[in-house]
């Protein structure tokens, strides 16, 4: 018998990291330089989700570039939010659109671009990009 840990059964308590991921939401704080245009580049190299058709895991690097307005995103919250996709059945295209929509709702940036660079599967490599510009910008 192996000594490797196994997933908890319903009777076992949920691990603290799993609780943090389940509660994961995008949190913001005031932009320290409102009124100044500057770019924030964030790379999330360990993104995972599940294929909605096969159930196989998908892996990607998510690139997030934005120009903040009045708020910036807290990085630990962003990490937990992204980790919440791990067991979710979602297409590559929908991943990028959901992340973009949630990011815009939380941070209301002047401009934002989300790029999902998904690892090749079956000799096919896919990159999905979506953008948003704040109205009136």
Curated annotation (Swiss-Prot):
Transmembrane segments: none annotated. Its EC number is 1.7.1.13. GO terms for molecular function: preQ1 synthase activity. Substrate binds at residues 73-75, 92-93. It catalyses: 7-aminomethyl-7-carbaguanine + 2 NADP(+) = 7-cyano-7-deazaguanine + 2 NADPH + 3 H(+). One of its GO terms (cellular component) is cytosol. Keywords: Cytoplasm, NADP, Oxidoreductase, Queuosine biosynthesis. It is found in: Cytoplasm. Pathway: tRNA modification; tRNA-queuosine biosynthesis. The keyword NADP applies. Belongs to the GTP cyclohydrolase I family. QueF type 1 subfamily. Catalyzes the NADPH-dependent reduction of 7-cyano-7-deazaguanine (preQ0) to 7-aminomethyl-7-deazaguanine (preQ1). NCBIfam families: QueF-II. This is NADPH-dependent 7-cyano-7-deazaguanine reductase.
């Amino acid at each position: 018998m192996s000594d490797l840990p196994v997933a908890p059964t319903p009777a076992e308590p949920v691990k603290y990291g799993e609780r943090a991921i389940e509660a994961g939401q995008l949190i913001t704080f005031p932009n320290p330089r409102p009124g100044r245009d500057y770019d924030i580049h964030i790379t999330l190299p360990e993104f995972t989700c599940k294929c909605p058709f096969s159930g196989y895991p998908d892996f990607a690097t998510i690139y997030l570039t934005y120009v903040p307005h009045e708020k910036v995103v807290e990085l630990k919250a962003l990490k937990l939010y992204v980790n919440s996709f791990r067991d979710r059945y979602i297409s590559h295209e929908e991943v990028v659109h959901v992340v973009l929509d949630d990011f815009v709702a939380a941070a209301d940036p002047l401009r934002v671009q989300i790029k999902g660079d998904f690892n090749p599967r079956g000799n096919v490599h896919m990159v999905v990009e979506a953008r948003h510009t704040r109205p009136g910008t």
